[in-house]
Amino acid sequence: VLIRVLANLLVLQLSYAQKSSELVIGGAECNINEHRSLALVYNSSGLLCCGILINQEWVLSAAHCDMENMQIYLGLHNISRPNQDQKRRVPKQKFFCLSNKTYTRWDKDIMLIKLNSPVPYSTHIAPLSLPSSPPIVGSVCRIMGWGATKSPNENVPHVPHCANINILHYSVCRATYGRLPAKSRTLCAGIPRRRIGSCLGDSGGPLICNGQVEGIVSWASKPCVHNGAPGMYTKVYDYTDWIRSIIGGNTSATCPL
């Protein structure tokens, strides 16, 4: 049943390109053991995102990935050949920076999901650590997801793709997109003049630097990585206190202003 449902969703999601967000352009199939924290987030309407397992009960994703009837798969690689240890969960609770789920392109695009039951760690399931410090400009980081590998005329793979990109100075994204504030709680990442980056279906997935989740895929250009345009990622380091407070039981904790 899972195979049929997910295969249909990968077709359906293309008609929802404006509702979901940003697959990996310019990457290659991930090694089956390098994305143990990567979650597939979807619903029966065809909306598709990714998430990041940070412990047995909690998944991080992007606020704009919130959807009704959310399903979360962990330990998945090829949707046509399920792994024996893959698990399906649904949200028990969802937490956002603001009660009305308000977020912008440069602030608070983050969602913390408590699973309905703990996920056992296994060969294909393991958590990713929260950052101990913010990444520095020039850092080489890893992106991954089931997002489109071409844009426009998106095609969606049955396996997650991975690629390496660099942390860029925020001014690069300001120059590319304009109208961004002088400061924001986002990271700018990509490879100038090369078409490598996140795309449709990758939203909510990780930007991994030095083995830690430094960013959450938020948004990028349309078409994806047009003329080598960088992508924008929620800066997880700025939200670590909020994340730890929520997980620790302080469900009224507020995000940084």
UniProtKB/Swiss-Prot annotation:
GO terms for molecular function: serine-type endopeptidase activity; toxin activity. One of its GO terms (biological process) is proteolysis. Residues 1-17 form the signal peptide. One of its GO terms (cellular component) is secretory granule. Residues 24-248 form the Peptidase S1 domain. InterPro entries: Peptidase_S1_PA, Peptidase_S1_PA_chymotrypsin, Peptidase_S1A, Trypsin_dom, TRYPSIN_HIS, TRYPSIN_SER. Disulfide bonds join 30-162, 49-65, 97-255, 141-209, 173-188, 199-224. It is found in: Secreted. PROSITE patterns: TRYPSIN_DOM, TRYPSIN_HIS, TRYPSIN_SER. Glycans are attached at residues 43, 78, 100, 250. SUPFAM superfamilies: Trypsin-like serine proteases. PANTHER family: KALLIKREIN-1, KALLIKREIN-RELATED. This is Snake venom serine protease rhinocerase 4. The lineage of its organism: Eukaryota, Metazoa, Chordata, Craniata, Vertebrata.
